[in-house]
C-alpha cells in the first residue's frame, strides 16, 4: 500500500489492514484513500487550505469546526480530529478540532456557532460518490 508503515499512519499499512479485513471492513476503500492522497491536486488543495488556516489563526479563529454531512465518514473525521489535536496541541498552542454531525448538531450547537464567541472557522464536509 506504500503509506507510512509506522506511527499514526500504521493503520493504513498492510499489517494495519489485516484487523480491518478480519472485522469485515473493505480494504479497497483504504486503497482508494491512499490513491487520493498521492494525487498532486489533493496536496495542492491541502497546501492552499493550510495557508488559509494560518491566516484564520492570525485572526484569532482557533476552533476548527467541521460540519460533517456524511454520516459514514464520522470515524474517519474522529481520526482526523485526533491527529490534529495531538499534532498541533503542543506548547500552549494549536487549534481545537471539532466535528459536528449534521443535521443533528444543527439543532443543538448551531446557535453557539452563530451567536457565541466568534473564534471558529468552518469546513463543510460532503462525500461525492464517483
Model-predicted segments: where are they?
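Active-site phosphate/pyrophosphate-binding segments
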Residues: 4-123
Amino acid at each position: 500500500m506504500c503509506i507510512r508503515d509506522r506511527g499514526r499512519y500504521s493503520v493504513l499499512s498492510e499489517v494495519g489492514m489485516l484487523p480491518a479485513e478480519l472485522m469485515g471492513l473493505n480494504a479497497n476503500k483504504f486503497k482508494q484513500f491512499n490513491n487520493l492522497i498521492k494525487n498532486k491536486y489533493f496536496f495542492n488543495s491541502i497546501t492552499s487550505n493550510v495557508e488559509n488556516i494560518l491566516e484564520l489563526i492570525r485572526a484569532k479563529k482557533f476552533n476548527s469546526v467541521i460540519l460533517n454531512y456524511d454520516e459514514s465518514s464520522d470515524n474517519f473525521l474522529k481520526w482526523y480530529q485526533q491527529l490534529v489535536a495531538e499534532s498541533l496541541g503542543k506548547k500552549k498552542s494549536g487549534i481545537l478540532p471539532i466535528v459536528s454531525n449534521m443535521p443533528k448538531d444543527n439543532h443543538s450547537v448551531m446557535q453557539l456557532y452563530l451567536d457565541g464567541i466568534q473564534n471558529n472557522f468552518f469546513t463543510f464536509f460532503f462525500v461525492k460518490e464517483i
